[in-house]
Amino acid sequence: SNTHFGSLVLLIPLALAAGRIADHEQDQETKLEEELARVLRSTAVQDAIDFYRAFDLAGARVVQVDDFSLKDPDWERKLIEGNQSLLELMRLSLDHDIVAREWATDFERSFQLAGRLQDMVSIYGLNDGVVRTFLEALAEVPDSLISAKFGREKAVEVSSLAVDALLDSTLNK
């Protein structure tokens, strides 16, 4: 459920931003990035509360944090008193959670990887292009879900395995 939950947390603001610009013919990519930034900055405390409730219902797992922890029985009161928007919560976790980092950086890595994916697919075809892009992304940044479930050391080990896979000559056939 973590993977699905994280995917939705990334896709929902993208879909909302894309829907807002769908009728315009100009530079869609630039407009998408700009509209996405507006969507993220428009989040409020209620969005953070709803996110926490959904997070709890989904049984998603992340690295434990000190501030605004879901394990804290007073998390909702603290969110309200701290006037914490969903974007502000994501900024608190950007150093240890990939999804939070995307929110905090206006999806910078997602847009970079989209361009890389496009290039890889044009060179290697759909399947191999997707696999290569995924391996490169995993090699560059340890996966926060692996880190949450098995520890940072294991996540770094998996990233190292992705590097090895990219260096394997059979991948280039």
Residue ranges and their predicted role:
Residues 1-2, 158:
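Short intrinsically disordered, low-complexity coil segments enriched in acidic
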